[in-house]
Every structure is written in structure tokens, then in C-alpha cells.
Amino acid sequence: MIQVKSTCLAYLAMAMMVLASLAVKAEDEMKPFILASVSSGNIADQLDGVKSELGGKGFEVVGEYSPYPTAHIIVVTNDALKKAAASHDRAGYVAGQRVTITRVGDEIQIAYTNPVYMGAAYRVKADLSAVADSLREALGADKEYGPEEGLTAEELEKYHYTFGMEYFDETNRLASYNSHKEAVAAVEKGLAAHIGGTSKVYRIDIPGSKQTVFGVSMAAKGETDNKFMDESFIMNEIDFKPLRSTGHLPYEILVKGSDVEALHGRFRIAVNFPDLSMMGENSFMNIMPSPDAIKDSLTLVAGGNLVDDF
């Protein structure tokens, strides 16, 4: 009898430990986007107020644009983000956080990227919770959203969508130059000429680091008629949930020393849409050519040469 009770107690203790570990994991899980508020009206009515609140909390607006009529994206940075971006030689991607105003039906959704999530995904060696707090104080924080289940910092640091898909550090090398200055000038020149269907959204130079990150919009127009690089087409396929993940845009080019690179599309898309299905309606299958099409446009604007992967 004593042995039976001891066995039962042991199983009960194990069950409690499992439940406790699951609770801790759920508490530590993060999602890529944070909903600030939902209101009525139109996008234009919200713009000045949002930018004023951001400025009041020390954020600098480095760029903004409307990728399509129902969305407006404001890219911000501050000293803490720039410092975090200098924590390693590929951390520049975290420097610009997106604040989005999106019309969905009669609703206006104001949201922003989760800097703590992005910091973990980009392996940043800094605590960005204070940045998240400042965004919350400026705009509000109703809830995190995106995938059904979040990811922990540990999972994000080694994230890839599935076997054979790229990790954070498996980037697309776009071009190489003799110096950082020359590389930056080449990207600026390409963006000014809208090569590859691109336009410049922002530029952030990372203090204390030979990193410069550009935000790049992409549209299939003029001589660039490949719909698979067009951000409107891509978002129409993958951003279909009631709460829109507009802050996925824009894509980035990072000048890292004298080299020019971009995150691989199969990582860049997946880390913001980790529960996107592989096949079916609204799936990766529908945008299968997009990672290569994005790479080609970014390579052209960086002054590089197109090279087939296979």
C-alpha cells in the first residue's frame, strides 16, 4: 500500500512538473506583432497623432510609405535600437521597427513589430524590453498577435521554418565592394534609379559599426513585371487573418562592411509568418518563386550580378 501511494505521488509530482514547464514556456512565448488599438475612421486621421506620440517617447521617424491603399507604414528607431544593432555585425536588421496603420473593412488597426521578438530572431545581444515599453506607452498594447502559438527566445535564435530552409545567418549575398562607403553609395544609386522595381523607404547608419540598413519597397511595375517580387501580391497571399501583419514590410538591405546582403526570403517571410501552411490556399506554395524574385530585385539594386542558385 505504501509503495502504491509512493508511486502515485511520484507520477503526480512528474505531472505537476510538466504542467509547470508548459506554463513557463507559454509565458515566455512571443509573437511578432503587437496590436495597439482598433478604431474607426480612416488612415489619414491617425497619422499625425501616431507620429506625435512616437516622437514624445523618443522615437525618430526614419521613413514611411503606403505599400497599398489600405496600409501605411512608419519606420522608427531610437538610441536603444541603434545600440542593439551594433551588438554584432548582422544585428543591423533590428534598427528599424515598424508602426502600421491598416484599414480592414470599417476598422483601423494600429500595430507595431514586437522589438523583443525581432531581437531574438536576429540574435541581438541586448534587452529590448525597454523599447517595447516605450512603444506601449506611446501607442498602447492590446495583445501580441501573428501565429496561433508564439515562439520563445531560444526557439527564435535558432529558427528556421522546416528542414532545408534557411536560418538567420544564411543570407543572400547581393554584391561586394572595396569599402563600406562605396557599397552604401552603390545601394543609394540603385534605389534612386528604382532599379528592380525598388524604392527607398529609409536608411539607418549604425553608430560604432560598419553597418547601414536600408528599407526597400518593391513593386512590379514598368520594366519589372515579375509579380512574385511585388509586396502587394505577396501580402495578398500570406496576410489574410483578421488582424493584419502589415509590419512584415518593408524588406531590408544590409551593408555589412564592404558587402551587401539581405535576409533570405525563406527566413524573412517565415519568421513573421511561422504558422503559414506549406500547401493549400494562402500558403508558401502560392509564393514559391518569391524568395528568388526578391533576391533578384535586391541584387540588381545593390549593383550585383544575378546568379542562379541551382
Feature map (PLM): residue ranges:
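Terminal, regulation- and interaction-focused segments at domain boundaries
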Residues: 27-68, 122, 143-218
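Mid-chain, structured segments of secreted extracytoplasmic proteins
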Residues: 72-114
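Bacterial N-terminal signal peptides that target proteins for export
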Residues: 2-12
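Hydrophobic alpha-helical segments and helix pairs
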Residues: 110-151
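Cleavable N-terminal signal peptides
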Residues: 13-14, 24
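Short, surface-exposed beta-strand/loop micro-motifs that present aromatic residues
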Residues: 99-100, 203, 250-254
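A cross-kingdom marker for long, charged
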Residues: 210-310
